[in-house]
Amino acid sequence: LRKAETTNADMVIGNRMSETSSMPYIRIAVNKLMSGILSKISGCDIPDSQCGFRLIKRNVLEAIKLESSNYEIESEIIIKAARKGFKIESAPIETVYKGAPSRINPVVDTLRFIAFILKMGTHPIFPKAIKGEK
């Protein structure tokens, strides 16, 4: 909440990437790849695009039409909020893994992410899409 107040951000995403010692290596690699792609597409610095710890102002959610229903929705919100000009920031948070198995499959979900990016027309080979043009 403090980050949103001090930066006037419309959306704040938690950032677990400053302390990754308890994070599985495959998760670090996949997260860095996905976050790098989303940072380029959105024009915002998104160090941890897959973090579910988020603050999203109501007007952001009211302004974007969401179409995804799985983990891609995290990326869809970032892309669409950035295209609408909303301010996106990140805030450091603690990485906590309590031994429970993740429901994320790094291979399958990465492939779904790639398909989602292509579907959105926001692959880096589409420079107009990066700027948010339709």
Descriptions of predicted regions:
Residues 40, 84, 120, 124:
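Phosphate/oxyanion-binding loops and surfaces in catalytic or ligand/nucleic-acid-binding neighborhoods
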Residues 77, 117:
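Aromatic/hydrophobic pocket-lining residues that form π-stacking "cages" and hydrophobic walls in ligand
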Residues 30, 51, 55-56, 78-82, ...:
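Residue-level signal for alpha-helical context at structural boundaries
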Residues 12-14, 48-49, 90, 126-130:
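Short, hydrophobic secondary-structure boundary micro-motifs
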Residues 1-71, 97-114:
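Acceptor/aglycone-binding surface of glycosyltransferases and processive sugar-polymer synthases
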Residues 44-45, 66-69, 78-96:
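Catalytic donor-sugar/metal-binding loop of nucleotide-sugar-dependent glycosyltransferases
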Residues 6, 112, 119-134:
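Terminal low-complexity segments of carbohydrate-biosynthetic enzymes
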